[in-house]
Amino acid sequence: IVLPEFEKSLKDILPLCAFGLVGEGSECYGYDDELSQDHDFGPSVCIWLRKDDYLKYKDRINEALKNLPKTYLGFQELKESEWGNNRRGLLNIDDFYFKFIGSANPPQTINNWQKIPETALATVTNGEVFIDNLGEFTKIREQLLNYYPEAIRQNKIATRLMNISQHGQYNYIRCLRRNDLVAANQCLYLFVDEVMHLVFLLNRRYKIFYKWANRALLDLKILGNEIHKLLEDMVFAQNKIPYVRKICKVLADELRNQKLTNCESEFLGDLGVDIQKNIDDEFFKNYSPWLD
């Protein structure tokens, strides 16, 4: 319903526009369900223009958008919550990217990459661009979708391995032996979060917001379904230690399969150290595997 309106009353602006659904909100990942309908739910679209075009044409475009039908396929138009404003409708490209990555341009240095939260990179590259007549929005998007430079990815993998081994293979078991169940559950949560993160890295995909990370595993080709099943089974198991060990073995096998390490140790921290010291970058080679 938006495109026909542009073709009718905003035909001169149409060549400057990109249309899509990208950014915050579970609908951008395709994860909306009945529970999602209690806030920020309804038919919506993002319309992106360059900053100068946005300032020049925003009044005309917003006036045209006001005249669109208030329902679509039986659904009411988007009702924004207090925290859901400025996600949809008319947006300018510079501000959209700056909101998530702190710049209107893709990162060019290791330091710039490290400053951007990974969940922000996931958010700014999710969803779909339906039409990009000018190509400006997609040009930046594609550079971000090309993923981290390999040295950064390997450093992040090494850090995940250090944390997985610390939380799951070491501290979880020690906390259980001390009968400190609160601390043990803290360890288990941290273990699960780092395991999920590692699977995203092995798939060269940015890790998404924690609430949807488990669901997103099902969309990842490398170990996604297997790790999802092991984590689900572990949650319901009385004795979780065998699952911790199995998960670590599966991850170690995949790391060796991807030729990231040839270390045969069962302790993932050893693999993390090995990967870090073999990164083909002088800065990262001497960087702590505990840091990313």
Outline where the language-model segments fall.
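A generic structural motif
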Residues: L49-Y54, R178-V182
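N-terminal regions immediately upstream of nucleotidyltransferase
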Residues: I1-P4
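Conserved NTP/Mg2+-binding pocket subregion across the NTase superfamily
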Residues: L55-L176
